[in-house]
Amino acid sequence: MAQQLPCVSSPRPLLAVPAGRWRAGVRGRPNVAGLGRGRLSLHAAAARPVAEAVQAEEDDDDDDEEVAEERFALGGACRVLAGMPAPLGATALRGGVNFAVYSSGASAASLCLFAPGDLKADRVTEEVPLDPLLNRTGNVWHVFIHGDQLHGMLYGYRFDGVFAPERGQYYDVSNVVVDPYAKAVVSRGEYGVPAPGGSCWPQMAGMIPLPYNKFDWQGDLPLGYHQKDLVIYEMHLRGFTKHNSSKTKHPGTYIGAVSKLDHLKELGVNCIELMPCHEFNELEYFSSSSKMNFWGYSTINFFSPMARYSSSGIRDSGCGAINEFKAFVREAHKRGIEVIMDVVFNHTAEGNEKGPILSFRGIDNSTYYMLAPKGEFYNYSGCGNTFNCNHPVVREFIVDCLRYWVTEMHVDGFRFDLASILTRGCSLWDPVNVYGSPMEGDMITTGTPLVAPPLIDMISNDPILGNVKLIAEAWDAGGLYQVGQFPHWNVWSEWNGKYRDTVRQFIKGTDGFAGAFAECLCGSPQLYQAGGRKPWHSINFVCAHDGFTLADLVTYNSKYNLSNGEDNRDGENHNLSWNCGEEGEFASLSVRRLRKRQMRNFFVCLMVSQGVPMFYMGDEYGHTKGGNNNTYCHDHYVNYFRWDKKEEQSSDLYRFCRLMTKFRKECESLGLEDFPTSERLKWHGHQPGKPDWSEASRFVAFTMKDETKGEIYVAFNTSHLPVVVGLPERSGFRWEPVVDTGKEAPYDFLTDGLPDRAVTVYQFSHFLNSNLYPMLSYSSIILVLRPDV
């Protein structure tokens, strides 16, 4: 038996969870790569003739000369001209539209035009064959359609060529595929509803652009925040307003989200990290169990905003989604909030060889995907295929896409899902070295991690992308873990998974983590300082869309994912959670109080750590998913922001989180540009100046000099015992409590406007006068230095 290649899909595998599987019972068009080639699945409408290239021969007395006959389309209303090979995609020019698409292996190609009604009826309005002599330059097919009748129409391509999966080729003239450079994609009209006839994969087509841009940016400019000043909020756009309690006019849409942006401003958030908003198919896994691809980590087209997040759906050929996304960004900027997009360039929705032919696979499979010599798909993504990111054509495509979202859509940065895949060597299908230098006969093995990946180099040094935020999820499903070691050119930040794990361990009282926890508070210098990076290259988080919510982290010791339909096999088993003594939501009063303290402790840690804090949508009010740590497939309340719950608890956890983000912004010392020095930061134990870094230590405290507050004292007691701590003496000053998670709200955060604040502080005077402070078990405190008057 042949040896199985690492992370290569087996001869006929199913897609790996959690991405779902290509099930035998999935409904949709039979344009599946694993099936044999079929007859044309779309037919041209009889009302309009197909324009064909005709070569006319004229006899002359001296010689024979071939003359290309002038061609027309759409009943003679449009002229068909040679066109230009650049730029790729559909480009509105004076008098018409230029179409250009890369395909290195196709022997024939045609442009398919759709009227919206014909697309819905699953038929091509008109097909324009491309002449390989006139309409091809190198590996780019191109054509210019002159005339106004294209406005409001849609387009796709047919490609013919070799269909040989064992050689990595899937050319099949029976499929109309979507242009990777399409700026909007139109398919089904309503979110979560199959097309007429029950199809979950109806024919898709790209929007033909208009020659003018009607969107009013109202003078919008980049906010240009320094990354050290960010407070990031990971948000799912549909989930943010889909719950009935949002009371928005257009729930689950870009416009609906705009109506709730003031909540984020009030919360102190100045950066949104949007979960995937590229065009994807939420019915990708649809079956009798009605599972959805809710999160959207399975892209169909990287240039197109998700059409079914638009309040207008597909009624305007996709223009509505573009303009509503722009409106969302513009209105966020007006409120001082940047927008970062979560982009999934590690794989696509086409899956493995049993997946559908939608776009990349039918255009040039061996260019766009990592393939083994016998055509198998490498599976470093865990989702059936791996995007061939460092191939010259693919990396050019990715950079073009990022530039578009920055220049046209005004986004402020990107978070790259499974970014370690972007560092792996590409498939080499020719004897030519695609890395541009002689290799003396040795080829880089497909998937090898590269020290200087060409794609990362291009992005890092691109003049247009130079000032945007770049965040890497520095690992992949193939076991490559690069946190602290991602190739960075001093511009890439990382989701700091080590911060998450260390903070979870220490806050729940695990021995042996005091020193590592202190490292996290300093911005993880052991990870980032030696490589020349700064604390703000660490994106600090405790919870994200993957895994438990903050409330579930302190409520469940085990995951409860049965509702996902995978027998609880999916999702992370290593959660480092602690239920505080009783499993589940319904617990005793003492356990519930402890859970409240723990949630606050985590949030205090996030806000006092050097680096960039990020928290997940709903954690500010204690959203629960019932212990499900992998809710990728649920389009209901478990993934919806509960505005009613936020209001119910506005005086409790939400108030605390809002005040903590405000406190962080007020303290210059909590967002330093460089790692704190010993002159500014001092460590303490139960007694000042005597930190305990022993294996059994569950107490960490520090003081930090601050330009606005003078000095702050922060302590974490994660022992099961209360403790009275000694405070550093400061002549002429006294310590005053601001935060104490051991106290019930509103005394957990003492504000100047609290009616009985003075009385509360006075109650501690007998301790404070002696430079002491009592701490409950599993609690954290913040004190500030005040003049002793």
Curated annotation (Swiss-Prot):
Taxonomy, superkingdom: Eukaryota
Keywords annotated in UniProt: Chloroplast, Hydrolase, Plastid, Transit peptide
A GO term for molecular function: isoamylase activity
GO biological process: amylopectin biosynthetic process; starch biosynthetic process; starch catabolic process
Keyword Acyltransferase listed: no
Disruption phenotype: In maize kernels, mutations in SU1 result in, increased sucrose concentration, decreased concentration of amylopectin, the branched component of starch, and accumulation of the highly branched glucopolysaccharide phytoglycogen.
Pathway where it operates: Glycan biosynthesis; starch biosynthesis
Organelle targeting peptide span: 1-44
Thermal properties: Optimum temperature is 30 degrees Celsius.
Assigned EC number: 3.2.1.68
One Gene Ontology term, aspect cellular component: chloroplast isoamylase complex
Biological role stated in the UniProt entry: Isoamylase starch-debranching enzyme involved in amylopectin biosynthesis in endosperm. Functions by removing excess branches or improper branches that interfere with the formation of double helices of the cluster chains of amylopectin and crystallization of starch.
Record protein name field: Isoamylase SU1, chloroplastic
Organism the protein comes from: Zea mays (Maize)
